A protein has these predicted regions:
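Hydrophobic faces of well-ordered beta-strands that scaffold small-molecule active sites
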Residues: 55-58, 81-83, 110-114, 137, ...
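Active-site beta-loop-alpha junctions enriched in small/polar residues
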Residues: 60-62, 86-88, 115-117, 142-144, ...
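Alpha/beta enzyme core
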Residues: 123-137, 141-151, 162-238
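Alpha/beta catalytic cores of nucleotide-metabolism and tRNA/nucleoside-modifying enzymes
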Residues: 1-51, 55-56, 61, 166, ...
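Glycine-rich, positively charged N-terminal anion/phosphate-binding segment
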Residues: 33-47, 60-135
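Flexible, glycine- and charge-enriched loops at secondary-structure boundaries
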Residues: 157-161, 222, 295
Length: 367
């Protein structure tokens, strides 16, 4: 558990991911740091793991590819990052192997998050991921996407606890590395029993739990219920990672003070802000927090993302780059007009020209 010496009242999320709200009373360097307990240890079935960084990057479908992970690593070299979600059935058929086979190319710890409704397929996928170098296996029991939940995967397992526990037991019995679970408070408020579900996961063999503070019914609406996460934390003996509405170092300190969690996982807040994990990590250690990149640095980062995606994905890279550029190009004068132009640019050359013209107005350097 990371214990903060003083809890602070909760504030609304920042309008720009990874950036404090305007009017924030003090820079992060002056906030009371937590009592740093050292690396987080996760028990495996013969192969334990240690996390030097207690800030985890969530798997993000269509986002957390190797290019994105490399950017996060620039600010957080020791953090546990994840591949995009991997469908166990697709992996079995050979369609998702690229996400797993590229693990060896990453410089730091990489977890593989699996989803499916078949225990045997999940166990076999876990074996493949372990053989490819996965740091740990995470089981997705929280994805709210309807087509996944309807087939019994992701948050659909919240409606079938018996199957959920069979999957955990099967995966835990198939690998030596730690098996963790990412889940939500429940399917809906009226039926949610997060403490009971979490205890069952622990008993089935989960060695850590990441808990998003919303139900599947909520999706990403409303506020994450950190108090509910705290109740689950008090009931467990395995580590608990808090997730939901952590978009700044200040949010992370408040979340840990309220929940008593062993760490935090950030997800959507890093879209366009790959520096967020590193800034939170510094805050939790009581170290000076790296500044948020300025406009010129953001534009240089956007240009770097564009070239990396074009090199990796060819013509399709431009389509993928648009969303990343849209997230990155925020928080400075003229950003809205630039984003509009980037979404309409039909060629790499036109996109490069827009970024270059914008950078000329600010001056740019690599963040």
């Amino acid at each position: 558990m990371i214990a903060s010496p003083q809890a602070a009242s909760r504030s609304s999320a920042s309008p720009v991911a990874g950036q404090p709200p305007s009017g924030s009373p003090a820079p992060m360097e002056k906030l009371s740091p937590p009592v740093w307990p050292g690396p987080l240890r996760l028990a495996g079935n013969g192969l334990d793991r240690q996390l030097p960084c207690r800030v985890l990057q969530s798997p993000l479908a269509g986002v957390s590819d190797r290019i994105f992970r490399n950017l996060v690593r620039r600010w957080a070299p020791e953090a546990l990052l994840f591949t995009e979600m991997v469908n166990a059935t697709s992996l079995e058929l050979g369609h998702g192997r690229g996400k797993v086979e590229e693990l060896a190319l990453d410089a730091g710890p990489i977890g593989v998050q699996l989803f499916d409704h078949r225990p045997e397929a999940m166990a076999e996928a876990a074996r493949r991921a372990e053989a490819s170098g996965a740091f740990l296996i995470d089981i997705n029991m929280g994805c709210p996407v309807r087509k996944i939940a309807r087939k019994g995967g992701g948050s659909g397992l919240l409606r079938d606890p018996e199957l959920a526990m069979r999957i955990v037991a099967a995966v835990a019995g198939a690998v030596r590395i730690p098996v963790t679970v990412k889940t939500r408070l429940g399917w809906c408020g009226s039926s949610a029993d997060p403490v009971g579900f979490a205890l069952s996961l622990q008993n089935a063999g989960a060695r850590a739990l990441t808990l998003h503070g919303r139900t599947r019914e909520q999706g990403f609406q409303g506020q994450a219920d950190w108090a509910a996460i705290a109740r689950v934390k008090r009931a467990l003996t395995i580590p608990l990672i808090a997730n939901g509405d952590v978009r700044s170092p200040e949010d992370a300190l408040r979340c840990l003070a309220l929940t008593g969690a062993d760490g935090v996982m950030v997800g959507r807040g890093t879209m366009g802000a790959p520096w967020l994990v590193g800034r939170i990590d510094a805050a939790l250690r009581g170290l000076p927090v790296p500044p948020i990149p300025d406009a010129g640095q953001r534009l240089a980062l956007a240009a770097e993302q564009l070239e990396a995606l074009l090199a990796a994905r060819g013509e399709k890279g431009l389509l993928i780059a648009r969303k990343h550029l849209g997230w990155t190009c925020q928080g400075f004068a003229g950003a809205a007009e630039l984003r509009h132009g980037l979404m309409r640019a039909g060629t790499p050359e036109a996109t490069r020209e827009l970024l270059a013209r914008a950078a000329d107005g600010f001056g740019s350097s690599r963040p």
